[in-house]
Amino acid sequence: MNNIKKDSQKDRPTYKDTLNLLQTNFGMRANATLREPELQAFWREKNIDFELGLNNSGETFTLHDGPPYANGTLHMGHALNKVLKDIINKFQTMKGKKVCYVPGWDCHGLPIELKVLQAMDKSQRAELTPIKLRKKAAAYAKKQVSQQMDGFKRWGVWGDWDQPYLSLDKKFEASQIKLFGEMVFKGYIYRGLKPVHWSPSSQTALAEAELEYPTGHTSKSIYVGFKVNQIPKRLTQEISKQAPDLINSEGKLKELKLVIWTTTPWTIPANEAISVNQKLEYVIAQSSDRSLIIIANDLLQEVSKSVGINYEKRVLIKGSILDGIIYKHPLFDKISPVVLGGDYITTESGTGLVHTAPGHGVDDFNTAKKYNLSISCPVDEKGFLTKEAGKFEGLNVLKDANSVIISDLINAGSLLKEIPYEHRYPYDWRTKKPTIFRATEQWFASVEGFRDKALSAIEDVIWLPESGKNRINSMVRERGDWCISRQRTWGVPIPVFYEKNGQEILLNKETISHIADLFSVHGADIWWEYEVSELLPPSYLNQADRWQKGTDTMDVWFDSGSSWSSVISKKENLNYPADLYLEGSDQHRGWFQSSLLTSVAVNEHAPFKKVLTHGFALDENGRKMSKSLGNIIDPLVIINGGSNKKLDPAYGADVLRLWVSSVDYSADVPIGSNILKQISDVYRKVRNTSRYLLGNLYDFDYKIDSIDIANLPLLDKWMLNRTAEVIDEISDAYNNFEFSKFFQTIQNFCVVDLSNFYLDIAKDRLYVSSKSDFRRRSCQTVLSLVIEKISGLIAPVLCHMAEDIWQNIPYDLEEASVFQRGWPNVPKSWKNSSFNCHVTELRKLRAVINRMLESCRNNQALGSSLEASVRVDISDEKVKAAIEWLAESESNNVDVLRDWFLVSSLQIGGEPWAEVLVSEDNDYASVEIAKARGFKCERCWHYEIEMSKNPQHTNICKRCEKVVLAI
């Protein structure tokens, strides 16, 4: 009785201190900016964040990290990628797999080189040597790696942070040289003159993966007439047959022009031929002023409309008959032939006649090789026309050359029309400036040599989503040889020596092996630091004066594409092929492809068993994030908050991680303040549900106080069965990388199954019962089992919350960390699906009653649902069976229908009531709600007819009297 306090105003007992109210240190608020770093420090201290996965005894699971570029601050794309990987790794770790996640960084390439140059003034640049540039670039890259690494750690990402792989590491560079050598020995590497994507802004060749195609590019497209100088006999015969009036009395044809269409007027000076498709039909057409042109038959009408001239068909001929026409260049005193090209010449656009500049297009180049044409390429590395372009020397092909050349074509009477043309055009992905095709001597990987093997290897890989297989298949099937050389300083050098006074190249097993050994000890800088004599193997020292070092470096995609060779095939506890590669969908043409090609070339199989791709992070309106739009979402601001905490609150890393789990990452995913609020609400619901469970366990020790599963009430057994179902559902979601299903399932479980149903019913058991009452201990047994499972289920995603829950479980646990417990298992004793049909029917009836009670509350007829009495007439057999099933266990004082419905009294059947607040008839029941009779118990709030007879406790019910008197 000493625990009973009195209300000073009413001078009667208050019973708050007799209730079993929540007690836990697990806060309602996460306080993530302080708590999450504390939990991360705990993981490090206990060697959980990396050693746990490494020390597991299960089979090895390897997710090989695609290296992000060591430049710039972390963005939402990084967050999406790294958190997805971490969710998978944590899940596999908890399943007992041996997980060794080695994070990596791509450290070479132009952007870093440009950052170094931008930080220097003109005088510093003038004194800059290649080796000084490389030293500065390496220092910059390492600084960026350190900053990005700190960000990844703050997100809760686990990995071997003490030994990441960097493409600038000595061992990595040496391994890359060895891989290059193996491809050389297999005959897959060659040097040749070919048109390649060239970036005048970067002054280097580019691979397809280094290009982007922004919208809105407009070119000056032109229709040009090339005057025919001589026609073959077969064509003359066809004209004589079909339109003899076109030939004059001297047997000569009136002036005839070949019409081409191009979007690169600056290439006209490099014209060496006009190509036609021998299978297409062409026409000689005549305008009203009697001028004649040759054009593809299917394009005549479209071209006539474009140039504004009406043409009449006069002669219909096959493309093969045009072979051998000789025409005059419109700007130079030069004649060239019409040749037969290939199927690349179509009638989808243009004129069906292709202006062929062999130095500026792959098809043009191949046609030129076929006909032994000159490979003219009058453009230098900066994009300026050279002496070969005659009077156009010095003009920039991307600036003033087009206008000047078009003007000269007008003056020559050769321009039919100039039309602005918006189309996809390749830009340098680093400088964001246009590129050109330019024929230069480059090093190539001969994809043609192992294309079929690569296509076969693609079939052996599981691609998620499946559309990824078709995408990379078409890319590999259609791609040309891979240009792997770059004219830059910051990269891994191509280890080749060129003869000073000849054409020989020194590149063999001995030289490559020697260079690789040197790099493994000293790093690639020695290529610039050492003399040739110091780089050549001993057997070549007497030839040092004969050779000079090459200056090209390797494509950065070759760097990252060789990571399988230097990381997963070399280090312990890693699988090659890797179990999984996971990157953005743009990597089908990037890292996935470069890794595939190098691995297939050397080992004839892919470096991965499974490939999973994700989309890009967009703003809430589906727009790409950019500074100009002002819509960039910073992961750091999500975690720590912005300068204005009301606008940008500090959500913590777990909310960021929960967002990742919530999205359909197979497509582009939106993120913004409204979405973050929604995710934060879900986070809060999971947290508050967990807090409620923990708060009701403050006096519970599972080893001492738990009730045997077999003796639990039906409600509790159903709750364990439902938990078992959720474990299976979430396990499947993780196994299938369907993390949004985890998000939906855990949210539904916490809100619908726990908060709105089981815990709603359990409040009376937990708060009002005596501490050791069966009603309470049975519920606490379930709460303890469920909270341990919830902690495990959310751990891969909400790793900080999961660990915080675990550390706040009030009884002793064998494991210090939830991650040491492992993945939640499902005891057989929990499973009993026969409960589901009965509980489903009762929940359906409960929902009807709740809706009716809510109506009464809205009308202010009722306050708490305990102020109500309910009468139910059951017409549905399933509902009747469910009520009978529950009634069999009423003696445990838990499985009581009025408690399930949270009302003070419930009557099944009987006469309709005279006074009701609301009633409803439906297909399965007739329900009436009236005000409860009796008196309100001040302790449990139930309305009872009989109250305590104890003069000190007349305002509580008999049930509560027993509890209070026993305290």
From Swiss-Prot:
Its main location: cytoplasm. It is an enzyme of class 6 (ligase). GO terms for biological process: isoleucyl-tRNA aminoacylation. Its cofactor is Zn(2+). It comes from the Bacteria. One of its GO terms (molecular function) is isoleucine-tRNA ligase activity. The keyword Transcription does not apply. Binds 1 zinc ion per subunit. One of its GO terms (cellular component) is cytoplasm. ATP binds at K627. A motif ('KMSKS' region) lies at residues 624-628. L-isoleucyl-5'-AMP binds at E583. It is found in: Cytoplasm. Zn(2+) binds at C937, C940, C957, C960. Pfam families: Anticodon_1 (PF08264), tRNA-synt_1 (PF00133), zf-FPG_IleRS (PF06827). A motif ('HIGH' region) lies at residues 68-78. Monomer. IleRS has two distinct active sites: one for aminoacylation and one for editing. The misactivated valine is translocated from the active site to the editing site, which sterically excludes the correctly activated isoleucine. The single editing site contains two valyl binding pockets, one specific for each substrate (Val-AMP or Val-tRNA(Ile)). Catalyzes the attachment of isoleucine to tRNA(Ile). As IleRS can inadvertently accommodate and process structurally similar amino acids such as valine, to avoid such errors it has two additional distinct tRNA(Ile)-dependent editing activities. One activity is designated as 'pretransfer' editing and involves the hydrolysis of activated Val-AMP. The other activity is designated 'posttransfer' editing and involves deacylation of mischarged Val-tRNA(Ile). Belongs to the class-I aminoacyl-tRNA synthetase family. IleS type 1 subfamily. This is Isoleucine--tRNA ligase. The lineage of its organism: Bacteria, Bacillati, Cyanobacteriota, Cyanophyceae, Synechococcales.
